[in-house]
Amino acid sequence: MFAHTLFRKRCAIWLLAIGIFLMLGSCAEKPSELERIKEEGVLRVITRNSPSTYFQDRNGEAGFEYELVKRFASTLGVELQIETADNIDDIFSRLNRPGGPALAAAGLVASEGRQELARFTRSYLDVTTQVVYHSGQRRPTSPKDLIGKRILVLKGSSQAEKLASLQVEYPELRYDESDAVEVVDLLRMVDEGQIDLTLVESNEMSMNQVYFSNIRAGFDVGEQNSLAWVVAKGEDDSLLKAADAFLEQAQQNGTLQRLRERYYGHVDVLGYVGAYAFAKHLQQRLPRYEKAFRETAKEHGIDWRLLAAIGYQESHWQPEATSKTGVRGLMMLTLRTANAMGVTNRLDPVQSIQGGGKYLVQVHASLPESIEEPDRTWFALAAYNVGGGHLEDARKLAEAEGLDPNKWLDVKQMLPRLSQKQWYSKTRYGYARGGEPVHFVANIRRYYDILTWVTQPQMEGQQLAKSELHIPGINSTDLMEELPPL
C-alpha cells in the first residue's frame, strides 16, 4: 500500500514537471525578427527599379540604395535578396504582408502620412520636393502657378501627399496619380510636353536632369524631406534598431559620403547647354567612331563607353582638334605619348583612339595596388590628364592632411593645391593646373553615365550598323549607369 501511494505521488510529480516544462516551452519567446534573419541567413529587401535606387546592368546589380543595403546585410553576416515592387503602394503592401520582405530600401520619404503604414529608420539623405516644368513654359514660382496645369505624379508618393495638402488651400488645383510610371517616365513626359508639370525629389531631379534638355526645376514644395528605410508595423524593433545603428555608423565612417559622391557627386557638371550639345553629338558624331571605340576597348578589356567619354571630353569627337599646347587628335595625345603608344598620325581617328586606349590601360596598371575600384578608375583618369607624378603629389598632400590617399573623394580636394605656391613648393613634381583633372574626371563620369543610359547592352564587336542609340525623350528604352571595369 505504501509503495503504491509513493508511486502515485511520483507520477503526480512527473506529470507536474512535464506540464511545467510544456508550459514554459509554449511561453518561450519567439526569436526576434533580427534573430530570424540571421538564422535564415537572408535579408529580403524590397525596392524600386530606378537609377537612384536599384538597377541591373551588364556588370550586375547597382544603385545607391542597393549598395547601402548590401553593406547592411554584410554587417549582419547574411545574404541580400532583392525584390522589386510594381509601384510605391506595392512596397507597403508587401512589406506588411505575412512572410513578406523584412525591409524596404527604396528612396522613400518618411512623410507624416506614411507613419501609419510602417516604421522608418533614421534618415540617410535629405532632399527637397521640386516642381519640374518644361523650359519653353513660364517658370512656376508658387503653388498658385500649379492651378490649371496638367500635373502627374507617382501614385502613393510623398509628392501626391504634398499636392493633396496644397489642395486644401487651393481647391482649384487638380492633379493625377499613376502607378504605371517611374520618375524617369514623368520627367520624359514633361520634356516631351505630354504633361505640364510633375513633382520629384531633388536627388532624382539632379541625377536625371542632364538626360532631358527641356526640363527645369521651378520651386521647392514644403520643407526638407528625409529619406529612410522602412520596416513593417509591429512591436518587434530588433531589425529597426540594427538598421539605425548601421546607418549611424555609415554616417560616421564615411560610407554614406562615399556613396553620395559616387552616385550624386558629379551630376551637375554639364548644365543645360552642355547636355544639349552632347545629345546632338551623340547622334551626329559618335556613330562615325563607335566601331573604333568598341574594337579598341575589346582589345584592352575596358568599357568602350568610358573610352568614348574620354574622347568627347578631349575633343568633342573631332579628329582634327588641336590645342595651343600642341596636343592633337580625337584623343588629344601629346607627341611624346603618341610616339610611346606607336601612333604615327595623331589626326587619324582610329590611331588616336587606339593610342588613347592603350595609354589609359597603362596608366591604370601603374597605380598603387592599394587603390581599389571604383576609385582606381577615377585616379587613372586624373593621371591620364595631369600625369602620374602630380597625382602622387596630391596623394601625399592628402595623407599629410589626415585624408585617405586611396580615395578619390579625398584626393580631389588636394589636386587644386598644386597650383598654389604654398603647396606645390613642397611637392616633388611642383606646379600643376590641379583643378583641371578634377573637372576632367567629373565631366567624363557624367558623359559615361549618359552613354551607359543611351546604349543598349550589346555584345562587344558587333557591327556599327547594328548599334542603336536611345536618347531619353526621343526613345523609350533607357539604361542605368554602371561603373567601368578596367
Swiss-Prot record:
Major localisation: membrane
Keyword Transmembrane helix: no
LT domain: region residues: 268-486
Alphabetized UniProt keyword annotations: Cell outer membrane, Cell wall biogenesis/degradation, Lyase, Membrane, Signal
GO cellular component assignments: cell outer membrane
InterPro entries in alphabetical order: Lysozyme-like_dom_sf (IPR023346), MltF (IPR023703), Solute-binding_3/MltF_N (IPR001638), Transglyc_AS (IPR000189), Transglycosylase_SLT_dom_1 (IPR008258)
Domain of life: Bacteria
CDD domains for this protein: MLTF-like, PBP2_YfhD_N
Annotated GO MF terms: peptidoglycan lytic transglycosylase activity
Annotated catalytic residues: 314
E.C. no: 4.2.2.n1
Membrane topology: Peripheral membrane protein
Catalyzed reactions: Exolytic cleavage of the (1->4)-beta-glycosidic linkage between N-acetylmuramic acid (MurNAc) and N-acetylglucosamine (GlcNAc) residues in peptidoglycan, from either the reducing or the non-reducing ends of the peptidoglycan chains, with concomitant formation of a 1,6-anhydrobond in the MurNAc residue
Any one GO BP annotation for this protein: peptidoglycan catabolic process
Keyword flag Membrane: yes
Top-level class of the enzyme under EC nomenclature: lyase
Region (Non-LT domain): 29-267
Subcellular location per the Swiss-Prot or TrEMBL entry: Cell outer membrane
Biological role: Murein-degrading enzyme that degrades murein glycan strands and insoluble, high-molecular weight murein sacculi, with the concomitant formation of a 1,6-anhydromuramoyl product. Lytic transglycosylases (LTs) play an integral role in the metabolism of the peptidoglycan (PG) sacculus. Their lytic action creates space within the PG sacculus to allow for its expansion as well as for the insertion of various structures such as secretion systems and flagella.
Protein family: In the N-terminal section; belongs to the bacterial solute-binding protein 3 family.
Family annotation (NCBIfam families): PRK10859.1
PANTHER family: MEMBRANE-BOUND LYTIC MUREIN TRANSGLYCOSYLASE F
Protein name: Membrane-bound lytic murein transglycosylase F
